Design a protein with these regions (language model features):
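Membrane-proximal, proline-rich intrinsically disordered regions
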Residues: 4, 19-64, 347, 385-386, ...
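Long, intrinsically disordered, low-complexity segments
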Residues: 18-19, 188, 273-275, 280-310, ...
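Aromatic-residue-lined binding/catalytic grooves and analogous aromatic/hydrophobic interfacial grooves
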Residues: 20-21, 194, 200, 212-261, ...
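Conserved, well-structured interaction surfaces
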Residues: 81-148, 176-184, 193-204, 453-458, ...
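Short coil/turn linking the two alpha-helices of tandem helical-hairpin repeats
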Residues: 121, 144-151, 204, 221-233, ...
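"A position-specific structural signal for the A-helix of alpha-solenoid helical repeats
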Residues: 128, 135, 142, 217, ...
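Flexible, polar/acidic helix-loop-strand segments at domain edges
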Residues: 327-461
């Protein structure tokens, strides 16, 4: 019987056996082959571990980003990811299953390499072991924040995920333990990441785990453990600062310039000084219709490829415009916030001047309106007009425009719907193409890496996040001066002259959260950031979602269900998450 290291996982990492079969399955390697010549085998083994991350990163993004408030979808969808958007949690969701399966495959492969190789043989072997510890710790962290409740809510009582570090010696008599607690899962995460930090001495670029990647992830992990602004955990906040210091002070990474930030998605990771760790993708992995089904394919249509059915939310666009209007029109292009460059409205051709605004259609639904603009002889917008048809009769209705900020072409308009007469502000702009009834504000932050396509290497850690981690942790410790310096480092890069003059207990939470939203949008962070700080997710903006719904951090739906197939296949008890608020443990 030949023991082999396989790239398969069914509910738990299994070391399979093959009797009388000399040819090993694809992605497998004989254990004796590895131990006899580890350096010759390591590349193939490590490639297998990283390959799991590529498949895992797709549902990882959708679980984290779609449950937030940075995007909207054109309409209801039968795709399983719509449950992430709607918070209609079910345990039978194939995308959630993929997130679980491919993550645990990565954990299994990393664990088996750790078990098979001894430390101290060479710097290269130690570094590879460190990469395995990093990947395992990182995956457990991404799991515990998705399936386990926020750390500030009774972490010793609430359940995290099963700790399955490799294959049992006796695979014929398996009895796996139930899910570890949230606290125990975090302990595993920290143990793995610290071991990774210790072992890794070779930096092979952002496509591979490194000492800096381990320190960056530890900074985030401790931030997640640092409590809320109202009740900070002063044991863990200093550790978030400590590990952020290690990354920032290492000199191994640098923030890109404002001009480069506007082109950030197009920079290949190995040429990007801000990138710490990414799940590296290459062009040969994206061919033909693959561009439709990658993450970027839902956000935009580029070169005729991509569904382009998810758009930047009005809430996110308002945040971008908060310090000044971002103008995407070709003839007057101006980005007040550099991060607005990741949004690309689809203007119709030839251009048609309109005023665009949002009104309540009824008591529960908001929607966009785009009306043609009429200018006077001096070129000043004076009214908007709309053609309404009742039966066979067409009537033109005109609406006076009042300047709110003429320089930025912001005007107020009084408009009537069945909800009543409403006076709102709108932008003079060109008409944006509609998908159903929603303007197509394409998102390109997950596309165009090195080419005009949807090629994208999902970001796990980059330097800007580390500055914001340190800002938040220092604010929770009452060190507002230090927090302000870091906050303004990121804000001032994106918005010329946009730095804050002060930061204190009255505004730190709002300002730091805002900057994390702006800077880390479309990196699968937003929903977790809201809930870990005890916030409430609100989506009071146009879209087919429930616009009146509010999801507080105490809700049972802030975490995902354990996939039912995983429960069914698990060799032991695998407890499901609560199915209503009565089962939620908060303290």
């Amino acid at each position: 019987m030949k023991k082999i290291l396989t790239a398969t996982f069914a509910a738990a990492a299994l070391l399979t056996t093959s009797c009388g079969v000399d040819r090993l399955p694809y992605g497998s390697m004989a254990a004796e082959q590895v131990t006899a010549d580890p350096e010759a085998s390591l590349d193939a083994l490590m490639n297998g571990v990283y390959a799991q991350l590529k498949t895992w990163s797709d549902p990882m993004h959708r679980c984290g980003e779609y449950a937030g408030d940075n995007m909207m979808i054109r309409g209801n969808s039968t795709d399983a990811f719509f449950e992430f958007i709607s918070f209609s949690r079910t345990p039978n969701n194939y995308r959630l299953q993929n997130f679980w399966d491919y993550g645990y495959k990565g954990i299994a492969q990393a664990s088996n390499i750790i078990a098979m190789l001894e430390e101290g043989q060479s710097a290269e072997i130690d570094n590879s072991l460190g990469e395995c510890y990093y990947i395992r710790g990182m995956l457990y962290f991404y799991f515990v924040r998705a399936y386990g409740r926020p750390y500030y809510q009774a972490p010793e009582k609430n359940l995290g995920v099963p700790i399955v570090n490799g294959t049992p010696e006796n695979i014929n008599d398996m009895a796996f333990e139930d899910r570890a607690t949230v606290a125990q899962t975090y302990e595993q995460v920290i143990s793995d990441l610290k071991k990774a930090e210790e072992l890794m001495t070779i930096d092979k670029g952002p496509g591979f785990a490194s000492k800096g990647a381990a320190q960056a992830m530890l900074s985030r992990v401790y931030l997640y453990m640092s409590g809320t602004y109202e009740q900070p955990n002063t044991q863990y906040a200093p550790l978030a600062v400590e590990y952020a210091d290690k990354v920032i002070n290492s000199g191994d990474y640098a923030l890109v310039s404002r001009a480069q930030l506007m082109e950030y998605p197009t920079i290949v990771p190995e040429n990007n000084p801000e990138a710490i760790f990414v799940v590296k993708r290459i062009a040969s992995e994206f061919v033909g219709y693959d561009h439709y089904y990658g993450v970027g394919g839902m956000y935009a249509n580029i070169g005729g490829m991509g569904w382009g059915e998810m758009f930047a939310s009005a809430k996110y666009i308002d945040l971008l415009n908060e310090t000044g209007r971002n103008d995407w029109r070709e003839e007057s292009y101006k980005m007040v916030d550099a991060r607005a460059a990741f949004i690309e409205p689809v203007y119709v051709s030839p251009a048609r001047e309109v005023i665009r605004f949002i009104v309540w259609d009824n008591a529960t639904t908001q929607n966009y309106v785009q009306l043609d603009v009429v200018r006077d002889a001096a070129g000043v917008p004076v009214k908007a007009k709309e053609t309404k048809k009742v039966g066979e009769t067409e009537t033109t209705v005109e609406y006076p425009l009042t300047a709110v900020d003429a320089d930025q072409e912001i005007y107020s308009i009084t408009y009537t719907t069945e909800f009543g007469k409403q006076t709102v502000n709108g932008f003079i702009d060109n008409y944006i193409n509609l998908n159903r009834v929603y303007p197509e504000f394409y998102i390109t932050k997950c596309s165009r890496e090195g080419e005009d396509s949807h090629l994208h290497s999902p970001v796990i850690s980059r330097l800007a996040e580390i500055y914001l981690n340190r800002a938040e942790a220092n604010a929770k410790l009452g060190k507002y001066g230090d927090a302000l310096t870091d906050l303004n480092t990121i804000r001032g890069r994106a918005i010329v002259g946009g730095e804050y003059e002060s930061l204190d207990a009255s505004n730190a939470a709002e300002r730091i959260d805002k900057e994390r939203t702006l800077e880390l949008a479309y990196q699968a962070e937003r929903s977790y950031d809201v809930f870990r700080n005890g916030g409430t997710l609100t989506r009071h903006y146009p879209g087919p979602h429930n616009q009146a719904q509010e999801i507080p951090a105490t809700e049972y739906r802030v975490v995902y269900y354990i996939p039912q197939n995983a429960i069914n296949a698990y060799p032991g008890t695998l407890t499901q998450n609560p199915t209503d608020n009565a089962g939620v443990i908060l303290n």
